[in-house]
Amino acid sequence: MTQQDGGQAGQAEPTKLWGGRFASGPAEAMAALSLSTHFDWRLAPYDIAGSRAHTRVLHKAGLLTADELERMLAGLDVLAADVESGAFQPVIDDEDVHTALERGLLERVGPELGGKLRAGRSRNDQVATLFRMWLRDAVRRVTSGVLDVVDALTAQAAAHPDAVLPGRTHLQHAQPVLLAHHLLAHCQSLLRDVSRLRDWDARTAFSPYGSGALAGSSLGLDPQAVAAELGFDGGAVDNSIDGTASRDFAAEAAFCLAMLGVNLSRVAEEVIIWNTAEFGYVTLDDAWATGSSIMPQKKNPDVAELARGKSGRLVGNLTGLLATLKAQPLAYNRDLQEDKEPVFDSVEQLDLLLPAMAGMLGTLTFHTERLAELAPAGFTLATDIAEWLVRQGVPFRVAHEASGECVRKAEARGAGLDELTDSELAATHPALTPEVREVLTVGGSIASRDAHGGTAPARVAEQRERVVATVAGHRQWLAG
């Protein structure tokens, strides 16, 4: 396409979207402070998509002729291709992504036609819309990564249906559980993260485009048409002031991402502990571990440690954004230039972390013999004695005391609960007949916990099936 009034892309004079009321340009330090292309340039494809939709509503409102519509859209297509290829880039004097792209459009269609695109829109409604568009796409990408992590955990659960380990509270041995049950517990929290992100998307699927600076447009434009073209399922926002000024969608996304980071950090912390020589639960695959520059024997769980560290970064991004948003009056304020970087960073960190977490978790080697050895340690079957007594009609208060006395006796002679003699059991409580031994094994304990959600093998198999089905449903949403 022939360049008009500006030569090659990137060589025209920088464009300001304001200035008629000013006798001089901004001071150098002022311009430097205002610059945002170093982080908002990623919004360029969304800005151009918005400009295409805006061009069409300008034509429908009679503000562009059919010929102008065709030439404007052609110019935007060329600009989009040049942005994608890198042929067009912002220059130092471009204040933001909007300014840079207007300069690029003027270079391609000329100032007379290109200048008409600004009618009926403001950077305020533009950036609020573009940010939503970018973030909705980013959330879908993050969601896919979370589901990959869930798939890795589910695959490990399927590969170890009978493996047992000591379940813990306060990091102390509590009750034996299936390894699959434990891994699927992490799946549940991660799937809630996905549900939160989907709920967030439903609230964010409204377009501020057409809100103008704050009061809406007087030019007969159709915000609903723009919303439909840009993929906003909810249509246009109901209040133009709210549309340009509100960033709760960004804060909510930052929370969802921070909560996801916290949940990932819990998985990561367990891998770090399990990988120690003292625990010896797992061995990391070489591809997902690192060594030491001085200690040849080291095999470090860096993926898990970075997950733990980055979770704090995500929480920091959330709190920083909330502090920025606090007490801003309606409508738009320049403080909102600071709304994007924390969210951009959170997404970037998860884009890096999620594939690594899925890879690390999916390739863990579990030492099931070690897990089975430790499962009954620490008197983890004590609760089974108490509940067995309850099933014999003994009040739980009494049963709890009797079970505690069994622990005391076993501990005193360095034995396990299953090693107490029949006479020792009967002396503790007359209802402790030899039949209690059916729950004094790890397998018996686990099999007895067959209520919904419990650790019995049949219940855990059901849980895994539901997780797999839930993941499939979320992937169907992503595909749609």
Curated annotation (Swiss-Prot):
EC class of the enzyme, as a word: lyase
GO aspect biological process, one term: L-arginine biosynthetic process
InterPro entries attached to this UniProt entry: Arg_succ_lyase_C (IPR029419), Argininosuccinate_lyase (IPR009049), Fumarase/histidase_N (IPR024083), Fumarate_lyase_CS (IPR020557), Fumarate_lyase_fam (IPR000362), Fumarate_lyase_N (IPR022761), L-Aspartase-like (IPR008948)
Annotated spans, Disordered: 1-20
Keyword Lyase part of the UniProt annotation: yes
Sequence similarity: Belongs to the lyase 1 family. Argininosuccinate lyase subfamily.
Pathway: Amino-acid biosynthesis; L-arginine biosynthesis; L-arginine from L-ornithine and carbamoyl phosphate: step 3/3
The organism's taxonomic lineage, starting at the top: Bacteria, Bacillati, Actinomycetota, Actinomycetes, Pseudonocardiales
Catalytic reaction list: 2-(N(omega)-L-arginino)succinate = fumarate + L-arginine
Subcellular localization(s) per the UniProt record: Cytoplasm
Source organism per UniProt: Saccharopolyspora erythraea (strain ATCC 11635 / DSM 40517 / JCM 4748 / NBRC 13426 / NCIMB 8594 / NRRL 2338)
The protein's name: Argininosuccinate lyase
SUPFAM superfamilies xrefs: L-aspartase-like
Record-listed E.C. numbers: 4.3.2.1
Predominant localisation class: cytoplasm
Gene: argH
